[in-house]
A protein has these predicted regions:
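Loop-to-transmembrane alpha-helix entry segments
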Residues: 21, 58, 74-94, 98-104, ...
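Hydrophobic/aromatic residues within transmembrane alpha-helices
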Residues: 45, 71-77, 139, 148, ...
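Hydrophobic residues within alpha-helical transmembrane segments
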Residues: 1, 25, 29, 60, ...
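Juxtamembrane helix-loop-helix junctions in multi-pass membrane proteins
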Residues: 1, 13, 128-158, 215-216
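Alpha-helical transmembrane segments of compact multi-pass small-molecule transporters, enriched
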Residues: 1-5, 57-71, 155-159, 220-234, ...
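Membrane-interface interhelical linkers
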Residues: 1-29, 39-49, 97-120, 157-193, ...
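Hydrophobic/small/kink-forming positions within alpha-helical transmembrane segments
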Residues: 4, 31-36, 62-67, 130, ...
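Structural motif at transmembrane-helix junctions in multi-pass transporters
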Residues: 40-57, 141-147, 203-223
Length: 261
């Protein structure tokens, strides 16, 4: 509801009325590719490979998004953009693997079949996440980010909430199972994170995808592991070793290539 309120305050009812069947279709597909199939596939991949490995593989999705943009949107992808995309992806994947090694996370104990299945699921996740960025680009043109996210979150909440309720009715929780909903004080602790990530972050994401070529916007939007490094260092949880520094340099070099392309 917050998205629609801000949309009406900033653009009136006309901003919401700009939704067309074309945009609704593409934005619905983006929900399927992200909150629907994409996140579900990632969950099952992480169960088989471990979260860091699954995330590293899924993080190649900017390559697919760049390909989609070049083939269907006529975006020009020169050598410098392609190099920048590959450097960003390589740097992010390297950082994720370094984080996994530092924490001792490994999927070696899993059977070979489970690891292969996890690999395929992680690759499918990368395609779904690329489909999300592509769908937002196709469906979000001409709309404000608040309208785009208002529709996406409303649809996702309705569908996922209904599925959860059906499952809850079929399989009621036992007396010793943890409750889904937290107390009011616990919920209030999440308010800053919700406003920062779900509202501000997702609005910036939509604006970037609809105002910049996918070959530039998608790699730059996928660099959260890079920004996690200084946070980890400041909190004293992660040392800055040579390998991590090299991974940062590779990622930043990719950013420079994309920005100056």
């Amino acid at each position: 509801p917050l998205f629609f309120v801000v949309a009406m305050l900033s653009g009136g009812l006309a901003s919401i009325g700009a939704l067309t069947l074309h945009s609704v279709g593409w934005l619905s597909l983006s929900v399927v590719c992200s909150y629907g199939l994409g996140d579900m596939l990632f969950y099952h991949a992480a169960m088989r490979l471990g979260t860091p490995t699954a995330l590293a593989i899924a993080s190649i999705y900017p390559l697919w998004a760049t390909l989609f943009g070049a083939l269907t949107l006529g975006e020009h992808v020169g050598g410098q953009r392609l190099l920048g995309t590959m450097l960003c992806v390589a740097g992010v994947v390297w950082l994720v693997f370094l984080q996994a090694a530092a924490k001792g996370d490994s999927a070696d104990a899993q059977p070979k079949r489970h690891r292969l299945t996890g690999l395929l699921l992680a690759l499918l996740t990368s395609l779904m996440w690329a489909g999300n960025t592509y769908s937002v680009r196709r469906g979000g043109i001409g709309l404000t980010p608040f309208v785009v996210n208002g529709f996406r979150y409303l649809l996702a909440s309705t569908v996922l909430g209904s599925l959860w309720l059906i499952r809850r009715l079929k399989h009621p929780p036992g007396p010793n199972e943890p409750q889904l909903f937290c107390s009011k004080p616990d919920l209030l602790r999440f308010v800053p994170a919700v406003i920062t990530e779900a509202f501000i972050g997702s609005s910036i994401f939509v604006y970037a995808m609809t105002h910049t070529d996918l070959s530039i916007a998608t790699p730059l939007a996928a660099m959260s592991p890079l920004f996690a490094v200084p946070v980890g260092i400041l909190l004293g949880g992660e040392p800055l070793d040579v390998r991590r520094l090299l991974a940062i340099i590779v990622t930043v070099a990719g950013v420079v290539c994309l920005v100056t392309a």
